[in-house]
Amino acid sequence: MNTNIFSTHLEFSKGVASVFKVIDTIHNISKNNNFNNILTQDFIIDTILSILWEDPNENEIFSSMIEDGETITNKNLSAQTKEGLLLNSNSFGLKFKYYNNAFRSWIDNYNPTSIDDVVYRFKDVNSICENNINEFKVKNYEVTVLPIYMQIANLHLLLLRDGMIYGDAWNLYRELGFSDQDSFYNHVLDKTKFYINDCLNYYNTGLSNLKLDPNNSWIDITRYCRFMTFYILDMISICPIYDTKVYDKPINMQTLTRKVYSDPVNFIDENIPISEYEKMYNISPELFSTLFSISFYTNKSGNKFLNGHVNRHVGTDLNYNGLRETHYGNYGSNYEVESMAFDDIKAYSNNYFNNTQNNNPTSVKSIKFLITKNNDEWIYGEPDSSNIDFTRNIQGYLSNLNNESYTHSLSDMILANNDKIQINIDTPHSYSYSWIYKGIEDTNYISDKLINQIPLVKEVKLKSRHYSEISVIKGPGFTGGDLILSKVHKPANQIPAQYMKNKITIPIKTKFPAGSQDFKVRLCYASNHDIGLIRLIAGSKYITTNIQQTFNTTENNPSLIYDDFKYFNFNETLSITSSGIDELYLEFYYSYTDGNFEDFPKLSIPYTRNYSC
């Protein structure tokens, strides 16, 4: 019996690694940014420019993006086209650098005489973005070069954000042809919507084309989704926080709750529809949870190999002791068991040692996990001593991945075809791994110093009654993860015994001094009706608002677009005490009107002090 080594983790090119530096920058600066003090404004554009155009090789990041685009779309650009893209990206980069230098000179010295230069540079770089960004849409290769287009679009939106923050001080709006800040603000909203829709449409086009090509396997689909989630979906999901009227305070961003998948281990090509592979290798939409432990079951005699495993997840209610278990393969008292606990640590990479037959991998002999605690490792089974220790490198970087530089932690270990596979040493066992972004916290924290963003998939209980239904559905790409669907259907001429109601239980943990604080509450949601009301409850206190229609359709589970979602504020503040309340309840009440009604809510809780919307 031979043993080969296989590894599973999230492959990072230098282009992908740079994008996560951009995302981390936006996360960190947005959490600490004080819009009320112009002198403490962090330089988001300045930091991003240093990431994307590194010295000494300023083409390295964008060259990596082009290579990634070619790989995942199976389309190669000509050398001349690549050279043109790099020249154009450098040209855009220089324009942004000139603006950034003028901006820094003004803000460092706060000298009114330097405003003219800032406005000139702003208008110059804004003009090239408005008129020339289509240089990054190469005909028939739009999806291939989409990672570059996205980064330029993101910089443009950040530029417009600067315009919203400083435009009055610069007398900028009339210089740009707008009557006032409000008209400029509407332009910013339109541009945000355009970039999000444009990038999402190209992402979906590329994915559809891959699925239609019979030469592509599930590996190709997984790789495309992974890379383009990093390059496109994650980026468009955070663009809405650039809205300075909605997010006018520091924000605890909790947007990127979606799972991403590394390439399957021991992939078995069964020549089945892509939709069937998705069921085998991916997790269906579900409430957010954190991996608590994995138990590995090994046969007690004969050749040792992995017969089964149990994933245990904990929800966002930190006071609840129960765990959700998912079972794979063979398990029970007839097998030896080893358990790896993740209750206070994360696994950010793992390594496989497989049994092989005819040089093909079959069953798993050992797995090595790299974990965040002291840069340590945990090993299931016994790896062959002839194999070297596995260390994941970020391609193009000299440094190794470690407990500081990782970006995603392990969420699920999945045995494909679990209900059909025969577990023996010579039967190929294929495994899939999902990962979640490290910036997502294990519960919902409420601070008096931040806008507290709460994706409603970070809940623990969904409850419905009568003709109502509440569930988790797959998000449309720009939401950062899955969504909650609150839905009712009342057949004609039938009257329920009571009103129709759906309820969401939201675990919280307060992070403010003893006593109670008043919070404003904002919902971002999509709704195909205006029948009913929403109530948010904290202990004995509650606030209500009427449901407002945001789009018009009679379809069940419609394809949601960015423009379907709107922000709505509760008219009253909600009083939350620092102790004694560990849950909020969001309730949807529907009247007796006949028809189908659907709501897709998201939640944020800003502190009221110095808050305006």
Curated annotation (Swiss-Prot):
GO molecular function terms attached to this record: signaling receptor binding; toxin activity
One of the GO BP terms on file: symbiont-mediated killing of host cell
Location in or out of the cell: Secreted
GO cellular component, one term: extracellular region
Pfam family for this entry, one: Endotoxin_C
Keywords: Secreted, Sporulation, Toxin, Virulence
Source species, domain of life: Bacteria
Matching Gene3D superfamilies: Galactose-binding domain-like, Pesticidal crystal protein, central domain, Pesticidal crystal protein, N-terminal domain
Function: Toxin active on mosquito larvae of the species Aedes aegypti, Culex pipiens and Anopheles stephensi.
Family, as annotated: Belongs to the delta endotoxin family.
Name of this chain's protein: Pesticidal crystal-like protein Cry16Aa
Annotated organism of origin: Paraclostridium bifermentans
Biological classification of the source: Bacteria, Bacillati, Bacillota, Clostridia, Peptostreptococcales
